[in-house]
């Protein structure tokens, strides 16, 4: 079991794990409350997977570390095991960018960290660099997860929005919608841009499209603002 210093497993996890672990189990997905409000209510929740068999795995990447299997996996989901995240909000993100750059340099065909690097450039307001890297992510043959591809497209749209290149922003938000029409996020971001541009009919249209999506998948991709 691997958790960070700013994470806490809720009581009872061991008994639940022992009751559900089978002889051929190698890895467990469980509930991760990545962000909580001041009353300890979850805001961002998804499954994570750092409970694993002792042998047959190794850790890779200098940041956003990945548990990489060297065996054939048999995974199970135990949603009643809950891990809460209590980050230090005063901690700087400045170390993430050079580590992600190092990670991508070491593994240039790793789609996951290419996506993370593009996102990190966006967070650092390096919008042109972010766009270039996110397009590289989309062009990787291994970048097949539609949710993450749509997020890269959405971040490209967001960067163009920040650069006040609104036509290109709209184009990429629409690409994100086409890639993953079952996610709220691209509809919401496009509606917000149309609100900024005072195109109210389109605000109403895309907001209603977002609200028609009721299912919130258990992945890290979901934005808080699409569901609050």
Identify the meaning behind each predicted range.
Residues 9-132:
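Catalytic-site signature of metal-activated, phosphate-bearing donor transferases
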Residues 1-10:
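Short beta-strand-to-loop acidic/aromatic patch adjacent to the donor-nucleotide binding site
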């Amino acid at each position: 079991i691997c958790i960070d210093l700013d994470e806490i497993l809720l009581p009872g996890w061991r008994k639940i794990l022992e009751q559900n672990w089978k002889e051929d189990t190698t890895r467990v997905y469980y509930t991760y409350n990545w962000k909580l409000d001041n009353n300890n209510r979850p805001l961002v929740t998804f499954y994570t997977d750092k409970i694993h068999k002792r042998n047959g795995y190794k850790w890779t990447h200098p940041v956003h570390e990945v548990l990489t299997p060297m065996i054939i996996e048999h995974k199970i989901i135990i949603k009643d095991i809950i891990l809460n995240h209590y980050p230090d909000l005063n901690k700087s993100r400045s170390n993430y960018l050079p580590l992600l750059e190092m990670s991508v340099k070491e593994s240039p065909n790793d789609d996951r960290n290419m996506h993370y690097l593009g996102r990190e450039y966006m967070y650092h307001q390096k919008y042109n660099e972010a766009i270039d890297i996110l397009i590289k992510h989309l062009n990787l043959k291994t970048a097949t997860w539609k949710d993450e591809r749509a997020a890269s497209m959405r971040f490209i749209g967001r960067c163009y929005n920040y650069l006040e290149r609104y036509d290109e922003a709209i184009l990429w938000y629409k690409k994100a919608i086409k890639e993953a029409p079952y996610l709220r996020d691209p509809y919401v971001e496009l509606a917000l841009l149309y609100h900024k541009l005072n195109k109210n009919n389109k605000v109403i249209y895309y907001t209603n499209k977002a609200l028609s999506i009721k299912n919130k998948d258990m992945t890290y991709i979901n934005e808080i603002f699409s569901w609050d």
